[in-house]
Amino acid sequence: MKLSAFDFNLPSELIAQSPSSERDNSDLLIAAMPPIKTKFYNIIDYLKEGDLLVLNNSKVIKAKLHLWKNVTINLNQKLSDDSWSAFAKPTRKLHVNDEFYFDNHKVIITEKLVMGEIKVKFDLDNISVFEFLDKYGEMPLPVYIRRSHSLYHTTSTLCHTRENGYSEKLDAFFRRNDIKDKDNDIVYDNERYQTIYSQIEGSVAAPTAGLHFTNDILDKLKTKGIHTAFLTLHVGAGTFLPVKTENIHEHKMHTEYCSITPETAEIINKAKQERRRIIAVGTTTLRTVESFCNNGIIKAGSFETDIFITPGFKFQTADMLLTNFHFPKSTLFMLICAFAGFKEMHELYKYAIKEKMRFFSYGDATLLYRK
């Protein structure tokens, strides 16, 4: 199929720049005939006793680092305990063996690849990489979320040297500009760009379908007899990479680490055997269960998946998919077209745009049924 077949006109004002006032107050579009627009807190009305929700428990790390002046990197994938791949901007200002200091810690450029990708090594003083990122990093918000007053556009002026530590310069910057709580946007995003059930650190972008859930909703689902199970897929920066080939089957899909425990595999297989509905919460969950499914059976394990789901794909696991609204010509829009129908998804998105529903990471959700 051609890439142009997955295009549609999306007004820029529908790109959500911030989350809804409350997690479950976002809109939810049920892909019925005709579509039903409601609030996410009503999702329980569209699920029934015995249903199984499968959710991604990966936790977003603070993967964005300001290295020097206007140079930033966004971590992509863990290569070893102290090494990661990353995307740099701009790469022309970086060289192999460049060293950047954050107080007593050091980040070293070890390799420059293509398309802005680099490899970095962390030389840290008695803390883990995740502990380092939690102190010095920022939430890796997608580039289409723009905050004119945010620290994301100002800390890039702060350089890191051994003589002038990061913490001191940053604190001075906050005092000088009278910024409270080290920028309210950052404090807010640290909470809202993370699911409430996230546990396993490793994602550099949020599994956004899960952002709408609250503890109250999870409690009500349990009371109604709706089951939950958790798996892990660490979302990589490649999730935002555009498809550049007109023939979509020539696109090279990025790889992402995923894992399913024996307990979760057993829960999913039992639901399938008992013919209960399985609802994948997010495209990351759907890609994971389909990656692990062989002849209708989920087997526990972990590996790197590069599964690319396009129309014609034979789904073996999920009956329904809860997901946010996706970019035109993206691999995720191709996925939902494969799951719920090419024509049907174009029509549903036309309806969503007419209803001014909010798109992408901080946007609204839709509940799809497998065609």
Swiss-Prot record:
Keywords: Cytoplasm, Queuosine biosynthesis, S-adenosyl-L-methionine, Transferase. Gene3D superfamilies: QueA-like. Its EC number is 2.4.99.17. Pathway: tRNA modification; tRNA-queuosine biosynthesis. GO terms for molecular function: S-adenosylmethionine:tRNA ribosyltransferase-isomerase activity. The keyword RNA-binding does not apply. It is found in: Cytoplasm. Transmembrane segments: none annotated. One of its GO terms (biological process) is queuosine biosynthetic process. GO terms for cellular component: cytoplasm. Its main location: cytoplasm. Transfers and isomerizes the ribose moiety from AdoMet to the 7-aminomethyl group of 7-deazaguanine (preQ1-tRNA) to give epoxyqueuosine (oQ-tRNA). This is S-adenosylmethionine:tRNA ribosyltransferase-isomerase. It comes from Rickettsia akari (strain Hartford).
